[in-house]
Curated annotation (Swiss-Prot):
Keyword presence, Nucleus: no
Further information: There are 2 isozymes of glycerophosphoryl diester phosphodiesterase in E.coli: a periplasmic isozyme (GlpQ) and a cytosolic isozyme (UgpQ).
Identification of the protein by name: Glycerophosphodiester phosphodiesterase, cytoplasmic
The reaction(s) this protein catalyses: a sn-glycero-3-phosphodiester + H2O = an alcohol + sn-glycerol 3-phosphate + H(+)
Function: Glycerophosphodiester phosphodiesterase hydrolyzes glycerophosphodiesters into glycerol-3-phosphate (G3P) and the corresponding alcohol.
PROSITE patterns associated with the record: GP_PDE
Annotated family: Belongs to the glycerophosphoryl diester phosphodiesterase family.
GO MF term set: glycerophosphocholine phosphodiesterase activity; glycerophosphodiester phosphodiesterase activity; glycerophosphoinositol glycerophosphodiesterase activity; magnesium ion binding
Gene expressing this chain: ugpQ
EC number: 3.1.4.46
Chain residues that bind a divalent metal cation: E39, D41, E114
Amino acid sequence: MSNWPYPRIVAHRGGGKLAPENTLASIDVGAKYGHKMIEFDAKLSKDGEIFLLHDDNLERTSNGWGVAGELNWQDLLRVDAGSWYSKMFKGEPLPLLSQVAERCREHGMMANIEIKPTTGTGPLTGKMVALAARELWAGMTPPLLSSFEIDALEAAQQAAPELPRGLLLDEWRDDWRELTARLGCVSIHLNHKLLNKARVMQLKDAGLRILVYTVNKPQRAAELLRWGVDCICTDAIDVIGPNFTAQ
């Protein structure tokens, strides 16, 4: 297998802005638009279940409240993660990573799993997500693991070294070369605003694949692809579709 089997366009948090993020419903919406790869955020419940949620807290994307990682899975099961977005999605639950893997299998979709630890749980979350991903995605294209948290990526590297890893950065770091080498990363995942053509060439010359987020304007997506960016992560999954090209 190539170390980069992934498509050009990735649906951010499953269904971009067209569904409640990080839910099975959002993955179905991404699939409906023909997307072949999704990005989503994974963290641990207090009792060690791996589920999808972006924020530390529940308030923004559910009717729950407080720090999600301080609750047991049975409590998190009661949370409605759909109504905040639309009545159409009322009762949509927080999904387990195992359910997401099954949905990816059904839809033939690849995955970028962002390891999103609750504050202070980086190493444990990195290890648990990597070990689970190895089992759950067996026989499928390996999921691309990424994180802003260095300690989470280190733990993922130790737990499942064969799974591809990407370093996430929201600000440029001059030590990107050393960091990606130490973590054995195949890719670097950057806020697209950090990039110009020269930086893209520099990263590519170092042998890294480049994923950028979150690009919602087709003109910008086309420019980035022309520069040599490998992957565009977008919320505008209807406008920047799975067959989008730089032309």
